[in-house]
Design a protein with these regions (language model features):
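Terminal targeting signals and extreme-terminal segments of soluble enzymes
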Residues: 1-285
Length: 285
């Protein structure tokens, strides 16, 4: 009797890399299925960069997990061919360090750098205990009592990324979608993959950038590009929904910070991040 074929998930397909022509070089492809606006979703860049570094750092099976990941994004990514250039900075006993550049060919024959990241890798399975202090998950309505993305505002409604994920916002923090932002600068909700793929460490890294911009809750609609991103991965997530919280405290001079925290279905904190975002200051009338 033939065993049933293993399911093929969109996220895993998007993270497929193949060997390049130089040491530390890998190739990948961005299709049109992870687009937000006209560009490829930044969370996918983070996960792809981590996937390439995992190959470089986990040769001995010691350091399979990103523990910290920091990136800048010089230019916006687009669907098409991707070159990843990885360099190991230090291979340690318990933690290793590396950097990765994500490049794409430009129309004029030059090469555009899309992301440059440095990362710390280790084994989160060996760092699950002891838990001396941690942040508890906020009490929010369950996914079935939250608001889906069916009524996404116009420029998000044309983003193929929404087809790849199931995202639910609490009614209290979804008012911006109806033109009624709370002004608090807070979003609470749930996220999972639309095709049923269960979360892992790379998908937590992706999910840290998967929610709508917290700027929307301030009534700042439009594009808020990520300028710098830093994440800490704290544990392997349990199966099920990921609970996400986004907050901001400072929006000044066209720059804002966005802090994210993610808990798994058991209530364990599995990821946290801070990113510096830009927003366009309205021109004076």
């Amino acid at each position: 009797m033939t065993a049933p074929a293993a399911p093929v998930y969109a996220f895993d397909q998007a993270l497929v890399v193949r060997a390049g022509s130089q040491p530390g070089e890998r190739y990948a492809e961005f299709d049109d299925q992870w687009r937000i606006g006209n560009g490829v979703h930044g969370g996918l860049l983070l996960a792809l960069g981590a996937a390439a570094l995992r190959i470089e750092l986990d040769g001995a099976g010691r350091h399979p997990d990103p523990v910290a990941f920091s990136a800048v994004f010089p230019t916006a990514s687009v669907p098409g061919h991707v070159v990843l250039q990885s360099e190991v900075l230090r291979a340690g006993a318990s933690l290793s360090q590396a950097q990765v550049r994500l490049l794409q060919p430009a129309a004029d024959g030059s090469v555009d750098e899309r992301m440059r990241a440095v990362a710390l890798f280790g084994d989160l399975g060996k760092r699950a205990e002891p838990v001396l202090k941690t942040a508890a998950a906020p009490t929010i309505p369950g996914p079935d009592q939250c608001v889906g993305s069916d009524g996404a505002i116009d420029f998000l409604a044309h983003s193929t990324l929404l087809d790849r994920m199931d995202i639910r916002l609490t009614p209290e923090t979804a008012g911006w979608a109806a033109g009624k932002p709370s002004g608090a600068g807070v979003l609470h909700g749930w996220v999972r993959f639309a095709d049923g793929r269960e979360p892992d460490v790379l998908s937590v890294l992706w999910a840290l950038d998967a929610m709508p911009p917290v700027a929307f809750d301030l009534g700042l609609y439009g594009w808020t590009p990520t300028l710098e991103f830093s994440a800490h991965l704290r544990a392997h997530p349990a199966p099920g929904w990921l609970q996400v919280e986004l907050t901001t405290q400072t929006v000044v001079g066209g720059l804002m910070e966005e802090d994210a925290r993610i808990w798994d279905s058991t209530g364990r904190l599995v990821g946290q991040s801070r990113q510096l975002c830009g927003w366009r200051v309205p021109a004076p009338r």
